[in-house]
Amino acid sequence: MWYYGRDPDFDRQINLPTGRCGLATSRDGIAWQAQTGPLTMGAVLEPHPDEKRFDSSHVGVSDVHERDGLYWMWYFGGSQITQTIGPYTVRGFDLRPGLAISRDGLHWSRVEGPYRGALLDVGAPGEFDMLMCGWPQVLQDATGWKMYYHTLEPRRGFLVGLAVSEDGLNWTRHGLVLEPGAAGGFDEQGAATRQVIRHGSDYLMFYEGVTKSGYRSIGLARSTDGVHWVREPGREPDGSIFAHAPRGSGRWDAFAIGTPSLVPMDDGSWRMYYIGSNESNQHAAGGEMALRHRIGLAVSDGPDLTRWRRWGE
């Protein structure tokens, strides 16, 4: 398992839970042991030392594939640029996707892209993804390669975009593919991190829906081509397929669950690893830095990908 995190002294003007990337291993997918990487504090990927690079302030991993004896890591990073977004002055919010290659999962070499090292640039002024293209997730199908990412448009919320490629290295922006949901819904403020999988003849997108007040749960959308998507109503009271723990419960994932990562099991069921965070009275003032992020696990009800329960419940 590759993940991102940060130490207490990491630049707090970067108001995201990213920083450096690490590796953990497990025999059963339940009990995990962090591995010591070759970089700062045991990381396996860290910000680039060249301040002109797209990934010089922080990095985060969002997808890893094994192909032809190599690990391909699609990651994202932010630069040294400082912006004012809403009530926050933040550094490195101009996220762009990058690629790194490894033989052992510990030692990584960046693949240089055309946009200060990135594979894809942010959109031009006025376009929906002009602020960022973050958390890339890649899928290969009969038509080539698809890269799903999300962005933030302050007046509309979080939006999912798509880029396409013939070789997984050279990418062309396709456009917006998923907008915010209906007013009052669990995804009224948009769709953020996500994973797209092939399931039979369909594409399924498990996405992090954001409410108007910032709470987050997992939703599901379906597509026949990976481009045009239709939301599927979930069984949770808020319309999601897997909801954050009840508000005020004090549980570790009572504020947000997101960044879904699905793994098929031999018995036909699925596991979904996710990042959760707690409620905090300081969130409005401190943003992401007021929250504690951890990794959790949910399991499906057999092959039914619309029914989920937390591991051990």
PLM feature segments, named:
Residues M1-E313:
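Carbohydrate-active catalytic/glycan-binding domains of CAZyme proteins
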